[in-house]
Amino acid sequence: MTDITFHGGVNDIGGNKFLVESKYTKVFMDFGMSFSQDGQFFSQFLGPRTSNSLNDLFELGILPKIKGLYRRDYAKHMDFDGYEDTEVDAVLLTHAHVDHCAYIPYLREDIPIYCSEESKLIMQNFDETGSDQYHTAKQRFQIYENNKGQISRASGDKVAVPRRIKIFESGKEFNLSLIHISE
C-alpha cells in the first residue's frame, strides 16, 4: 500500500512537498516554497532569522517537523532532536522553480535529489548567483580558532559538503529505490 502525505501545495500556489511512502521507501516529491505563506510572513528584505531559520519555519507551519530530514548542523544548533538517521530515501524534483525546490537547502546533504539535467543547471545557477546551497551544504555553525588565536566561524569551500544529485532523463522511466517512476 502506498500513502501520500501533503505537507504543502494543497489549495495554494507553490509550496509543493508531498511525501510518498510505501512499505520500504519514503520519497518527497518536491520541497518548495508557498508564495502565499512566504508573503504572509516575509518580504524581499525580511526572511527567517539565519541562526534560527528552521525553528522559524516550523513555528510558522511552513516546513514539516520531521526528524532526520533536515541538515544536522541546523538541527543541532537549534536543539531540534532531528540529527539521527533519516528515513527519507530521496527527493524527486519535478522541476527547479522555487515553488518546487526553494527549501532543498535545508535538507540533509546525504539525502539524494533526483532531477533532470536542466533542473540541476538551474539549481547550480541559484548557487552561483545567490546565497542558497542546492549543490553543496556549507556548514553554518562551525567555529574554529584562527591563526590570531581568535574564534572565527568557518565559511566558504572549507565547510562545503557536496549534495548527492542524481540525474534522470526527462521522459524516461526509472526506479527510485522500490518506486517505479514513469510518465
Give, region by region, the residue ranges found by the protein language model.
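Divalent metal-coordination and catalytic microenvironments
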Residues: 4, 30, 95-96
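Short Gly/Pro-enriched turn/cap motifs at secondary-structure boundaries
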Residues: 8-10
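Short beta-strand scaffold segments in enzyme catalytic cores
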Residues: 15-20
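Pre-active-site segment of Zn-dependent metallo-hydrolases
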Residues: 25-92, 119, 124-140, 144-145
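Di-metal (Zn2+ and/or Mg2+/Mn2+) metal-binding site signature of metallo-dependent hydrolases
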Residues: 84-110
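Short internal beta-strands
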Residues: 112-120
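Active-site neighborhood of divalent metal-dependent phosphoester bond hydrolases
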Residues: 129-167
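Conserved small/polar residues in nucleotide/adenosyl-binding loops
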Residues: 179-183
